[in-house]
Amino acid sequence: MTVRQRRFAMVILVVIGVSIATGLGLKAFQENILFFYNPTQIMAGEVPTDTSIRVGGVVVNGSVKRESGNLDVQFDLTDMAQTVTVVYSGLLPDLFREGQGIVAMGKLGPNKVFEASEVLAKHDEEYMPPEVADSLAKTKANTEDKL
Protein backbone atom coordinates (compact mmCIF):
# COMPACT_ATOMS: atom_id res chain seq x y z
CA MET A 1 0.00 0.00 0.00
CA THR A 2 1.32 3.40 -0.90
CA VAL A 3 1.32 6.37 1.44
CA ARG A 4 -1.52 7.93 -0.50
CA GLN A 5 -3.67 4.80 -0.23
CA ARG A 6 -3.02 4.52 3.52
CA ARG A 7 -3.94 8.17 4.03
CA PHE A 8 -7.15 7.70 2.01
CA ALA A 9 -8.07 4.58 4.04
CA MET A 10 -7.46 6.49 7.28
CA VAL A 11 -9.69 9.37 6.13
CA ILE A 12 -12.45 6.90 5.21
CA LEU A 13 -12.20 5.20 8.63
CA VAL A 14 -12.39 8.56 10.42
CA VAL A 15 -15.44 9.61 8.38
CA ILE A 16 -17.17 6.29 9.12
CA GLY A 17 -16.35 6.59 12.84
CA VAL A 18 -17.67 10.16 13.06
CA SER A 19 -20.82 9.15 11.16
CA ILE A 20 -21.51 6.25 13.53
CA ALA A 21 -20.91 8.43 16.61
CA THR A 22 -23.21 11.15 15.25
CA GLY A 23 -25.92 8.64 14.41
CA LEU A 24 -25.81 7.06 17.87
CA GLY A 25 -25.85 10.47 19.54
CA LEU A 26 -28.88 11.62 17.54
CA LYS A 27 -30.74 8.39 18.26
CA ALA A 28 -30.13 8.72 22.01
CA PHE A 29 -31.24 12.36 21.93
CA GLN A 30 -34.40 11.52 19.97
CA GLU A 31 -35.40 8.80 22.44
CA ASN A 32 -35.04 11.14 25.43
CA ILE A 33 -36.85 14.18 24.08
CA LEU A 34 -40.28 14.94 25.59
CA PHE A 35 -42.65 17.05 23.53
CA PHE A 36 -45.08 19.43 25.23
CA TYR A 37 -48.80 19.37 24.43
CA ASN A 38 -51.83 21.14 25.85
CA PRO A 39 -55.26 19.59 26.55
CA THR A 40 -56.71 21.00 23.31
CA GLN A 41 -54.08 19.17 21.24
CA ILE A 42 -54.68 15.96 23.20
CA MET A 43 -58.44 16.07 22.70
CA ALA A 44 -57.95 16.85 18.98
CA GLY A 45 -55.89 13.65 18.60
CA GLU A 46 -52.64 15.41 17.70
CA VAL A 47 -50.65 13.46 20.29
CA PRO A 48 -48.70 10.20 19.79
CA THR A 49 -49.85 7.40 22.08
CA ASP A 50 -46.67 5.33 21.98
CA THR A 51 -44.18 7.85 23.39
CA SER A 52 -43.76 9.84 26.58
CA ILE A 53 -44.93 13.44 26.41
CA ARG A 54 -45.49 16.41 28.70
CA VAL A 55 -48.91 18.00 29.16
CA GLY A 56 -49.47 21.28 30.92
CA GLY A 57 -52.36 23.35 32.11
CA VAL A 58 -54.31 24.40 35.16
CA VAL A 59 -55.81 21.89 37.61
CA VAL A 60 -59.61 22.26 37.47
CA ASN A 61 -61.22 23.29 40.76
CA GLY A 62 -63.10 20.41 42.40
CA SER A 63 -61.61 17.77 40.10
CA VAL A 64 -59.00 16.19 42.39
CA LYS A 65 -60.09 12.70 43.50
CA ARG A 66 -57.89 10.63 45.78
CA GLU A 67 -58.38 6.95 46.51
CA SER A 68 -58.22 6.04 50.17
CA GLY A 69 -55.59 3.52 51.16
CA ASN A 70 -53.17 4.20 48.29
CA LEU A 71 -51.44 7.03 46.45
CA ASP A 72 -53.65 7.02 43.34
CA VAL A 73 -55.05 10.40 42.35
CA GLN A 74 -57.14 11.58 39.42
CA PHE A 75 -57.64 15.20 38.36
CA ASP A 76 -58.62 17.25 35.35
CA LEU A 77 -56.22 19.57 33.57
CA THR A 78 -57.44 22.44 31.38
CA ASP A 79 -56.08 25.08 29.04
CA MET A 80 -59.38 27.01 29.36
CA ALA A 81 -60.67 25.50 26.11
CA GLN A 82 -60.46 21.72 26.61
CA THR A 83 -60.00 19.44 29.60
CA VAL A 84 -58.08 16.17 29.89
CA THR A 85 -58.23 13.69 32.77
CA VAL A 86 -54.89 12.82 34.39
CA VAL A 87 -54.27 9.75 36.55
CA TYR A 88 -51.17 9.52 38.74
CA SER A 89 -49.91 7.10 41.35
CA GLY A 90 -47.42 8.60 43.75
CA LEU A 91 -46.77 11.55 46.00
CA LEU A 92 -47.87 14.86 44.55
CA PRO A 93 -45.63 17.90 45.02
CA ASP A 94 -46.34 20.03 48.09
CA LEU A 95 -47.30 22.96 45.85
CA PHE A 96 -49.89 20.94 43.91
CA ARG A 97 -53.41 22.28 44.37
CA GLU A 98 -56.53 23.08 42.40
CA GLY A 99 -56.41 26.18 40.25
CA GLN A 100 -52.62 26.04 39.85
CA GLY A 101 -50.50 25.43 36.77
CA ILE A 102 -48.70 22.09 36.49
CA VAL A 103 -46.77 20.01 33.99
CA ALA A 104 -47.26 16.24 33.96
CA MET A 105 -45.02 13.75 32.17
CA GLY A 106 -46.28 10.38 30.99
CA LYS A 107 -48.21 8.67 28.19
CA LEU A 108 -51.66 9.05 26.73
CA GLY A 109 -53.74 6.01 27.63
CA PRO A 110 -57.05 4.69 26.35
CA ASN A 111 -60.04 7.04 26.13
CA LYS A 112 -57.67 10.04 26.07
CA VAL A 113 -56.81 9.66 29.76
CA PHE A 114 -53.28 10.86 30.47
CA GLU A 115 -51.29 8.41 32.64
CA ALA A 116 -48.70 10.57 34.40
CA SER A 117 -45.42 9.17 35.67
CA GLU A 118 -44.33 12.51 37.15
CA VAL A 119 -46.15 15.70 38.17
CA LEU A 120 -44.36 19.04 38.51
CA ALA A 121 -46.02 22.01 40.22
CA LYS A 122 -45.25 25.69 39.94
CA HIS A 123 -42.84 27.33 42.38
CA ASP A 124 -44.70 30.39 43.64
CA GLU A 125 -47.78 32.47 42.95
CA GLU A 126 -46.20 34.38 40.08
CA TYR A 127 -44.46 31.50 38.30
CA MET A 128 -46.04 29.41 35.59
CA PRO A 129 -44.04 27.05 33.37
CA PRO A 130 -43.31 28.87 30.08
CA GLU A 131 -44.94 26.14 27.97
CA VAL A 132 -48.13 26.34 30.03
CA ALA A 133 -48.23 30.14 29.92
CA ASP A 134 -47.74 30.16 26.13
CA SER A 135 -50.36 27.46 25.66
CA LEU A 136 -52.92 29.27 27.81
CA ALA A 137 -52.26 32.57 26.02
CA LYS A 138 -52.74 30.97 22.58
CA THR A 139 -55.92 29.20 23.65
CA LYS A 140 -57.31 32.39 25.18
CA ALA A 141 -56.55 34.34 21.99
CA ASN A 142 -58.20 31.67 19.81
CA THR A 143 -61.27 31.61 22.06
CA GLU A 144 -61.61 35.40 21.95
CA ASP A 145 -61.28 35.39 18.15
CA LYS A 146 -64.20 32.97 17.84
CA LEU A 147 -66.50 35.14 19.96
UniProtKB/Swiss-Prot annotation:
Query: Is Hydrolase there in the keyword field?
Result: no
**SUPFAM superfamilies, per database record:** Heme chaperone CcmE
The membrane topology noted for this protein in its Swiss-Prot or TrEMBL record is: Single-pass type II membrane protein
Determine if Thylakoid is one of this entry's keywords: no
Enumerate the InterPro entries for this protein: CcmE, CcmE-like_sf, NA-bd_OB-fold
Q: Give the Cytoplasmic membrane side ranges.
A: 1-7
Q: Which GO terms describe its molecular function?
A: heme binding; metal ion binding
> Which residues face the membrane's Periplasmic side?
29-147
One GO process term, biological-process aspect: cytochrome complex assembly
Question: Looking at the record's lineage, which domain of life comes first?
Answer: Bacteria
Quote the subcellular location field of this record.
Answer: Cell inner membrane
Which residue ranges traverse the bilayer? 8-28
Entry binding sites for heme: H123, Y127
State the UniProt keywords alphabetically: Cell inner membrane, Cell membrane, Cytochrome c-type biogenesis, Heme, Iron, Membrane, Metal-binding, Signal-anchor, Transmembrane, Transmembrane helix
Residues of the signal sequence?
none
**Gene Ontology cellular-component annotations:** plasma membrane
Q: Which Pfam families match?
A: CcmE (PF03100)
Give the similarity note: Belongs to the CcmE/CycJ family.
Q: What does this protein do?
A: Heme chaperone required for the biogenesis of c-type cytochromes. Transiently binds heme delivered by CcmC and transfers the heme to apo-cytochromes in a process facilitated by CcmF and CcmH.
* Record protein name field: Cytochrome c-type biogenesis protein CcmE
Gene that specifies this protein: ccmE
